[in-house]
Amino acid sequence: MKKNLITSVLMTVVTTVLLGLVYPLLITGLAQVFFKDKANGQIISANGHAIGSRIIGQPFTGPAYFHSRPSAAGNGYDASNSGGTNLGPTNQKLVDRVKQDVSALQPEANGKPIPVDMITTSASGLDPHVTPANAEFQVARVARERGMSETQLRQLVARHTEGRQVGFLGEPRVNVLELNLDLDGTQPMPTPR
């Protein structure tokens, strides 16, 4: 009995050290060597300050910016509250929110169909991407607010459209933060008069 107890305690200590200390440090070290940017959250900096992450969305509300899709992660892309809403398609709370979002987008739609990712959240609630259709839907508004041509803006969106991974995984997508940063660099907002 004493031998079994010693063996059990020893196994617990060994596995705790191996799996709780050695393995995480090894994986962290390998990630820092081979995937430094990805291991550190793919932070985007401007003027020496971190302004966001390439892999975590953030809200944009001004009319001169492309807007991200709605977030189910708390109050606007709160990473500590990540996750879907678990609201089913017949849940009245979800139905009311979608109706409200559709109503708010109707003036901008001008008869065009509203892309589904403009009114639905992603599984994590933190998705930094929108579909190319979502970006296209917003082109007229952003071009008008920035005082630039829709053609010029579509070229900018095309430059930021990422294809499928390995040619067949996922869907084409546009990173909203990167697009808006490039937009600010290409065509700063007009100064108010």
Curated annotation (Swiss-Prot):
Part of the high-affinity ATP-driven potassium transport (or Kdp) system, which catalyzes the hydrolysis of ATP coupled with the electrogenic transport of potassium into the cytoplasm. This subunit acts as a catalytic chaperone that increases the ATP-binding affinity of the ATP-hydrolyzing subunit KdpB by the formation of a transient KdpB/KdpC/ATP ternary complex. The chain crosses the membrane at residues 9-29. GO terms for cellular component: plasma membrane. It holds the Pfam family KdpC. Its main location: membrane. Belongs to the KdpC family. This is Potassium-transporting ATPase KdpC subunit. It is a single-pass membrane protein. PANTHER family: POTASSIUM-TRANSPORTING ATPASE C CHAIN (PTHR30042), POTASSIUM-TRANSPORTING ATPASE KDPC SUBUNIT (PTHR30042:SF2). The system is composed of three essential subunits: KdpA, KdpB and KdpC. InterPro entries: KdpC. Keywords: ATP-binding, Cell inner membrane, Cell membrane, Ion transport, Membrane, Nucleotide-binding, Potassium, Potassium transport, Transmembrane, Transmembrane helix, Transport. One of its GO terms (molecular function) is ATP binding. The gene is kdpC. It is found in: Cell inner membrane. Disulfide bonds: none annotated. It comes from the Bacteria. It comes from Koribacter versatilis (strain Ellin345).
